[in-house]
Amino acid sequence: VPYSDPNDLRRLKVDHAYENSERGYVLRNIGSKYNPSRQTKWIPEITKQDFWQLYMNHIQIMKEKFPKTSGRICSYCLKEYSFMRRLGTRGKGYTGQKGQVQTNFSIDRYDSRLTYKYNNVVFCCVGCNQRKRDSNPNDWNNYIRVGREIGYGT
């Protein structure tokens, strides 16, 4: 069976087409949160179906806020996100952040000290998720306080 060969170009093209669709990209992203090979302490407290429902709700809310858009908008920068993967990445695991498309869809934990659960899941772009990576709400309050103290923006 030619498609059983993971390096078969036909299979790579079919996989690539699916993974560059919104559904394929988002489901792979959600599924990665449950991958047993992930070395993480953040085991989601919600199901894959809950993630999908939260995503659909996010789209609806964004469509209401921005009626002339598709609703596929980053919660942080309010720009539309994309769904693009490189050809031939299926089964390769984590391939590093080099070359990641900054506008791609991503799932963030609002408070990075907590796991994926209701009221802690944010749909955003990769760029915003990376910029927020090493901070938490306490840090943000400190940044705002220091900015006010030094007169930033006045």
Stretches found by the model and what they are:
Residues E22, N29, T69, R86-Y94, ...:
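Intrinsically disordered, low-complexity segments enriched in small/polar residues
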Residues P2-R10, T89-K92:
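Short Lys/Arg-rich cationic patches that frequently serve as NLS/NoLS or arginine-rich RNA/DNA-binding motifs
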Residues Y3-S4, I43-I46, Y116, S135:
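Short coil/turn linker and secondary-structure boundary residues
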Residues T115, N119, F123-V126, Q130-T154:
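A detector for short metal-coordination/catalytic motifs
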Residues K79-F123, K132:
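Histidine-centered nuclease catalytic patch
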Residues R10-Y76, R113:
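Short, charged surface segments at domain edges that flank catalytic/cofactor-binding sites
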Residues S75-L78, G127:
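Short, cysteine/histidine-rich loop/knuckle motifs that typically chelate Zn2+
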